[in-house]
UniProtKB/Swiss-Prot annotation:
PANTHER family: 1-DEOXY-D-XYLULOSE 5-PHOSPHATE REDUCTOISOMERASE, 1-DEOXY-D-XYLULOSE 5-PHOSPHATE REDUCTOISOMERASE, CHLOROPLASTIC
Positions of 1-deoxy-D-xylulose 5-phosphate binding: K127, S153, E154, S190, H213, S226, N231, K232, E235
EC number(s) from the headed UniProt entry: 1.1.1.267
Binding, NADPH: T10, G11, S12, I13, G36, R37, N38, N126, E128, G219
Protein name as catalogued: 1-deoxy-D-xylulose 5-phosphate reductoisomerase
Task performed by this protein: Catalyzes the NADPH-dependent rearrangement and reduction of 1-deoxy-D-xylulose-5-phosphate (DXP) to 2-C-methyl-D-erythritol 4-phosphate (MEP).
One biological process term in Gene Ontology: isopentenyl diphosphate biosynthetic process, methylerythritol 4-phosphate pathway involved in terpenoid biosynthetic process
Record GO terms (molecular function): 1-deoxy-D-xylulose-5-phosphate reductoisomerase activity; manganese ion binding; NADPH binding
Family, similarity comment: Belongs to the DXR family.
Length: 408
């Protein structure tokens, strides 16, 4: 039995994680849950999973949550915490073996660091933690004897493929050191909602268009990131930190079927790939169960049913966010944190219909350019948090100026 903590239990990753726990009750027990504001769903999760502790980030909802839980008439009610301190306490909860980080965006950084500092194994679905704070996270993992296991499909695929390398059983794939025998990583991308749209039509994109993914069922923010290909650009940075691979050896390839989740190329020119239906539950389960594999009743992959797998190079003009991510990664230091925060704010403003779809990379680019003179190549955690806040304010202020920018 593995005891798990789920950070962001009411979100997409969190709900799927708890579905797995319900499907495998003899393998997993959720002992700690956290959420942002959704006390209705959190109450239902408490009823089903009976955790030892729960936390709600919005402190104004603590009493309402307590009332909801009291009305459940449980034999043993969980401890109820609130605010950021409560979330951090849940992240470091003593009984948990593994912490699944499903909090969206850079908001998940501090709780993830709390879990690492408590020596927990991390099933990382919050890629922003590594993107913004990779230089801090990697040493902290080593210091606290903690292991980071990717719970997103692409990095889980790479992680699984890497186990085909020599001496993989002795390797620690969360050290930022490139595994022996690895030559290159090929990250597959669906191409997002607009993969078949002509570039000239992107000026007409609506929020509804951008939040409709052809293959995956995800939250709105990450679906927009998929449409801009920023999601894949961020995954390039994450792969760099996770697997110690240089940016020159991490490539993006459009794969519309989303069946091959990523590939690795080895020194002898062999290529290994991991295949599966586009379902986030599989990488989440593997991050939770590793080094074991647990039996499921999920639909088996049928290649004859699929018929064909196709690939093409991404269009740099159509996906400018991809180039911005590579550039920020190569700049290193605090630049990836600025990129990530600027993107989060730009996407937020797009979802509120304050800017157009094609303006998203424009405002990200402006933030990165403005930060260049203050780039810190050896940041501490406080520096990361400071530039994260600066980038959000910068983008919001630029948008408020009301200027009309052309897309880059």
């Amino acid at each position: 039995m593995k005891y798990i903590t789920v950070l962001g239990s009411t979100g997409s990753i969190g709900t799927q994680t708890l579905e797995i726990a319900s499907e495998q009750p003899d393998k997993f027990k959720a002992v700690a849950l956290s959420a942002g504001r959704n006390i209705t769903l959190l109450t239902e999760q408490v009823k089903t999973h009976k955790p030892e502790v729960v936390a709600i980030e919005d402190e104004n909802l603590i009493e309402d949550l307590k009332d909801n839980i009291n009305n459940l008439d449980l034999d043993s009610a969980p401890l109820v915490l609130g605010g950021k301190e409560g979330i951090n306490a849940v992240a470091a909860w003593d009984k948990a073996d593994t912490v699944i980080t499903g909090i969206v965006g850079c908001a998940g950084l501090i709780p993830t660091m709390s879990a690492i500092n408590a020596g927990k194994n991390i099933a990382l679905a919050n890629k922003e933690t590594l993107i913004a704070a990779g230089p801090i996270v990697i040493p902290a993992l080593k210091k606290n004897n903690s292991r980071l296991l990717p719970a997103d499909s692409e990095h889980s695929a790479i992680f699984q493929c890497l186990q085909g390398l020599p001496n993989y059983e002795n390797a620690d794939f969360s050290t930022g050191v490139m595994p022996k025998g690895l030559k290159a990583i090929h990250l597959t991308a669906s191409g997002g909602a607009f993969r078949d749209w002509p570039v000239e039509n992107l000026k007409h994109v609506t929020v509804e268009d951008a939040t409709s993914h052809p293959n995956w069922d995800m939250g709105k923010k990450i679906t927009v990131d998929s449409a801009t290909l920023m999601n894949k650009g961020l995954e390039v940075i994450e792969a760099h930190y996770l697997f110690g691979t240089s940016y020159e050896n991490i490539e993006i390839v459009i794969h519309p079927q989303s069946i091959i989740h990523s590939m690795i190329e080895m020194e002898d020119s062999s290529v290994l790939a991991q295949l599966g239906w586009p379902d986030m539950k599989l990488p989440i389960l593997y991050a939770m169960s590793w080094p074991e594999r647990f039996k499921t009743n999920w639909k088996r992959l049928n290649l004859s049913e699929i018929g064909k797998l196709t690939f093409k190079e991404p269009d740099e003009f159509k996906y400018p966010c991809m180039g911005l991510a590579y550039a920020a990664g190569k700049s290193s230091g605090t630049m990836p944190a600025v990129l990530n925060a600027a993107n989060e704010m730009a996407v937020e403003q797009f979802l509120k219909e304050k800017i157009s779809f094609q303006e998203i990379p424009t405002f990200i680019s402006k933030a990165c350019e403005s930060h260049m003179e203050n780039l810190n190549l050896s940041p501490e955690l406080e520096d990361i948090l400071e530039v994260d806040n600066w980038a959000r304010i910068f983008v919001k202020q630029e948008i408020k100026k009301g200027k009309k920018y052309v897309s880059i």
